[in-house]
Amino acid sequence: MKLNDLVQHISHTGASETDITAITYDSRKACAGSLFVCLVGAWLDGHTYAESAYQNGCRAFLVEHRVDLPADAVQIVTDDTRAALAVIGADFYGNPADELHLIGITGTKGKTTTALLTAAIMTEAGLPCAYIGSNGVDIAGVHEATANTTPESLELHRLFRKMLDAGVRHCVLEVSSQALRHHRVDGVPFEVVAFTNLSEDHIGPGEHPDFEDYKCAKRRLFAEYNARTMVYNVDDPYSDFMREGFKGEQISFGIQNAADYHGQSLAQYRSQTALGVDFDCVHAGETTHIEVMSPGTFSASDALCAVALCGAFGVTPAQAAATLAHTPVQGRFEVVEGLPGRTFIVDYSHNGLALTSALKTLRAYNPHRLLCVFGSVGGRTQVRRKELADASSAYADYTIITSDNPDNEPPEDVIRDIAGHMAPGAPYTCITDRREAIYAAVKMAEPGDIVLFAGKGHEDYQLINGKKLHFVEREIIKEACAEISK
């Protein structure tokens, strides 16, 4: 594709008939024939890597300001390279999103569970549906890992093209506030969008400066994308704010308040391999009994959202119920079998609201003791660390504070911050190495105990000093159980 053709739909200066065979924003992947896009992020500026891309053979650059490169380097200057990438990425892959039925889900909690359940229901109902989100990418049974909940726009359009090539015509995406803020989904023609809930999170360096900015970023999905249908949580106090200005069809779901999809008669259940919740879904005057393989009101709410989303494509609650009864979500209230009489739970609850909800839900099972193992991500605000400490102090019988993804912050500093917020008298210990913390919790567990390992969930790594190190919590729990059983 000629460079001039590639940039024809963006505002720019500069021109060239150079042939472009690839687009990248990673200088390590730049080569002859590629266009290197200099993205400006919270911590890194792609312009500083332009010379590295040049050394790798790249001669075409999309920049926000000219950089010092040899004369044979073509520089196309535009106001915002992230916004431009969304346009040229779509054009480069032939605008595949235009041929797809796209579902976008946003909210503080529940995006992953709702999206995965939606994809499973749609697929079993005869509408093969891909998934993009925190748990990676699934297209026709083929899995890919992702660096972000919502990939960069270039990756999205590559994935959309891959879906079409695989014969998949539906896709559900988790849409993060960062994706909305940084143009990752600009121009994506969402057909149906959903709002799960909103609470104070993702505020701090590199994220949102305050709650107002976070809240408004979320609302962009409903105010700016012209979807035909919006599904929203009528129980959430911010649902009216999210609905402002949406001109399409609106479908509500809820448990506490009357809704188009209303959940009632909730009851927890416990089996050998799962903790769950069942409830009745009332829709259009008909009642459908639904079982979900994760417990709590939040799980029921996420399932209702998925049922409503699928309903927007003609799938009935009865069809949805048949899928939900046998569909677990990895890393969300995932039961790890190990020692007799003990229940080990892996869950992604990584902020105060999620951890409070998880612990209160597990309390309803009347355990002998409820133990909680958690840490907090490095580089985030004190608010999250305090809220996590408050939750575990209030609802756990014993807490082990450990590392999560400390990244470039010393894990001991993060742990010290959390410990400083634990309530007076709340029993806890600090173990920096998360593997050691897991072993300690497994050894400590007695018959009748429930142990919650919070924060990692589906993740298969720990982020330490900028490096992703292999770390799968469920595997380590099983290792610890096997060692203790010897």
Task: Give the residues covered by each predicted segment.
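ATP-dependent carboxylate-amine ligase
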Residues: M1-H12, A30-L35, C305-A318, A322-G331, ...
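N-terminal leader/targeting and accessory segments in enzymes
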Residues: M1-V87, D91, P237, T273, ...
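Acidic, Mg2+-coordinating active-site environments of NTP-dependent enzymes
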Residues: L3, V67-D72, A166, V192-F344, ...
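Residue-level signal for inorganic ion chemistry
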Residues: L6, S34, A53, I88, ...
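Short, hydrophobic beta-strand segments that form beta-sheet elements in well-ordered domains
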Residues: A22-Y25, G57-E64, L173, T229-N233, ...
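Generic hydrophobic/aromatic pocket-lining and core-packing "Φ" positions
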Residues: A50, A119, F160, K218, ...
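Receiver (REC) domain switch/active-site residues of two-component response regulators
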Residues: R59, E191, D397
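Phosphate-binding loop of NTP-binding sites
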Residues: L85-V234, D240-F246, Y365-N366, S485
